[in-house]
A protein has these predicted regions:
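Bacterial Sec-dependent N-terminal signal peptides
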Residues: 1-19
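N-terminal, active-site-proximal structural segment of metallo-dependent hydrolase catalytic domains
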Residues: 15-110, 114-124
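Metal-dependent phosphoester-hydrolase catalytic domains
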Residues: 15-16, 154-156
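Short Gly/Pro-enriched turn/cap motifs at secondary-structure boundaries
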Residues: 117-119, 150-155
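Short, surface-exposed beta-strand/loop micro-motifs that present aromatic residues
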Residues: 158-161
């Protein structure tokens, strides 16, 4: 009986399959705007003179906090690695993404980003952070939002990256 259990145990060990595990995340950046106006965008609330009094201190604090949160994502399962890719919403432009990936916690992992300027009048876009050692994008496409109701036909908003 003991030999049968040993044989079954050895067979079970040999039958195990190895899997690669990658972390994938998503984080709404909750209006990650810089302090400069983007021509053609309604980003006036996020200027130093705007309703949010969005200044350099608020902007740099937000960058630092978001970078720390993004770098921590997935480390409970993959310590020192984190997520291979992280979808982002509510980012203003490539400038804020440059500043975000330059933050020490993200720069240490070498994150890059994909960003496509969308039609949202407020200047809110989607982006994808990725670790090029773990993920290589093949194509980039912004799929536009298609209104479902006739009253939504004039509503321009961000699409899907």
């Amino acid at each position: 009986m003991l030999s049968l259990l040993l044989v079954l145990g050895l067979l079970r060990l040999n039958a195990q399959t190895n899997y690669s595990v990658y972390g994938v995340g998503f984080y709404n950046q909750e209006n990650l705007f810089d302090t400069c106006h983007d021509e053609g965008k309604k980003d006036y609330d996020f200027l130093p003179t705007g309703s949010y009094k969005w200044d350099k201190l608020k902007y740099t604090n937000k960058l630092r906090n978001m970078a720390r949160a993004l770098a921590d994502m997935g480390t409970d399962v993959l310590p020192k690695v984190g997520c291979a890719m992280i979808g982002l919403s509510e980012v203003e432009n490539a400038r804020v993404l440059d500043a975000l990936v330059a933050q020490p916690p993200l720069a240490a992992r070498g994150y890059r980003y994909i960003h496509v300027e969308g039609p949202d009048r407020r200047g809110i876009d989607c982006a994808l952070l990725y670790n090029p050692q773990l993920f290589t994008p093949q194509t980039v496409k912004l799929v536009p939002y298609i209104p479902q109701l006739p009253k939504d036909s004039a509503f321009r908003t961000r699409g899907y990256l």
